[in-house]
């Protein structure tokens, strides 16, 4: 039994979000939420919300016990980039990419 939650186009670069995702992959759901709660990173707040949503999906849709859930899979994929322009010297311009992420969390019963 598995439950899934997805956050699309989160305004954080995938590289930064993957640093936090690697810390909680494979942990029990309760421990993952606790670890994310005390992290200072912006990605930790976003990932915590997705993990809590996946836990709620498992609890409400499948009647799973929260104590037995574990973070089976957590993926951070690249979303669409927002293109911005920054003026530079001599009339030139530089393109700035504001990157976004798709965060997917799958929780399931620990075996």
From Swiss-Prot:
Keyword annotations of the record: Ribonucleoprotein, Ribosomal protein, RNA-binding, rRNA-binding
Membrane-crossing residue ranges in chain numbering: none
Taxonomic source organism: Xanthomonas oryzae pv. oryzae (strain PXO99A)
GN (gene name): rplV
Annotated protein name in UniProt: Large ribosomal subunit protein uL22
Function recorded in the entry: This protein binds specifically to 23S rRNA; its binding is stimulated by other ribosomal proteins, e.g. L4, L17, and L20. It is important during the early stages of 50S assembly. It makes multiple contacts with different domains of the 23S rRNA in the assembled 50S subunit and ribosome.
Entry's family note: Belongs to the universal ribosomal protein uL22 family.
Subunit organization: Part of the 50S ribosomal subunit.
Pfam families, A to Z: Ribosomal_L22 (PF00237)
GO CC entries: cytosolic large ribosomal subunit
GO MF term set: rRNA binding; structural constituent of ribosome
PROSITE patterns given in the database record: RIBOSOMAL_L22
GO biological process: translation
InterPro entries found in the cross-reference section: Ribosomal_uL22 (IPR001063), Ribosomal_uL22_bac/chlpt-type (IPR005727), Ribosomal_uL22_bac/org-type (IPR047867), Ribosomal_uL22_CS (IPR018260), Ribosomal_uL22_sf (IPR036394)
């Amino acid at each position: 039994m598995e439950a899934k939650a997805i956050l699309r186009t989160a305004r954080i670069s995938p590289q930064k979000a993957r640093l936090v995702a690697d810390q909680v992959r494979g942990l029990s759901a309760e421990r993952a939420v606790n670890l994310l709660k005390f992290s200072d990173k912006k990605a930790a707040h976003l990932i915590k919300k997705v993990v809590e949503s996946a836990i709620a999906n498992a609890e409400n849709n499948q009647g799973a016990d929260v104590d037995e859930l574990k973070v089976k899979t957590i993926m951070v994929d690249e979303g669409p980039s927002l293109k911005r322009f920054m003026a530079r010297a001599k009339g030139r311009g530089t393109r700035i990419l504001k990157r976004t992420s798709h965060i997917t969390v799958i929780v399931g019963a620990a075996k």
